[in-house]
Amino acid sequence: MFIKTCAPQDSFISKLVPIMAQATQILLEEYQNYCAGGEFNIQEKSDDSPVTQADLKVNRFLLKHLAEFTPELPVLSEEGDYSARQAWQCCWMLDPLDGTKEFIHERDEFTINLSLIEGNETTFAIISVPCEQVMYIGYQSQLPYKYSFSRQEWFQYQVEEHDLATPLQIGL
C-alpha cells in the first residue's frame, strides 16, 4: 500500500523526475494525436516488431537529457545498436515505449521504463505510466516511491506488518 509522504530528499530522483515527466508528456501527446486520427508513422524493425514515431521521439528526448545528466553513462536503448553495448558494466537501460502494440491498438497500457544497471543488477528504476499520470521510482533493496503528476504528490510503499505468530488459514 502506498502512503502519502514528502518528496524524497535525493538529488538523483529530483533531477530525473522532471526529465521523465517531460518524456511522459511527449508520449501522452503522441498517443492522443494517434487516437484522434492525426498523422502518425509506424514502421517495422528487423525483428518484425513495430516501432512508432512516439518510440523514436521519446527515445531522442531521453538520450539527450540522460547524456546531459550523466555524461559518463551510456544508454542501452531498445531502439539502439547491440554491438556497441555488449561490454558495458554500467549503463542506463531504456525502453521509451514499453507496450508499442498496446499503444497501436489504442489501449492505454504502455509505459516508459528507465533503469540504471551496474554489473548485472538493476540498482535504480523509474517506470512512468502516462495514461495514469503516475511514476514508480525505486532503488534496489529500498521501498519504492510513487509520484502522481496530476496531484503533484509523493507516496511511499508501506509494508503491512503481519503477526507472524498467527498462522495463515488457506482454504476451508
Give the label of every model feature segment.
Residues 90-131:
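Glycine-rich active-site/cofactor-binding loop and its immediate structural neighborhood
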Residues 75, 92, 112, 170-171:
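Well-ordered beta-strand positions enriched in small/hydrophobic/aromatic, beta-favoring residues
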Residues 84-85, 101-104, 135:
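Conserved protein kinase catalytic core
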Residues 114-172:
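Acidic beta-strand-loop-alpha-helix segment within the catalytic core
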Residues 1-97:
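N-terminal subdomain of lithium-sensitive/metallo-dependent phosphomonoesterases centered on the IMPase/IPPase/PAP
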Residues 25-26, 101, 127, 140:
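Charged/polar positions on well-ordered alpha helices
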Residues 68, 108-111, 142:
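Residues in and immediately flanking transmembrane alpha helices
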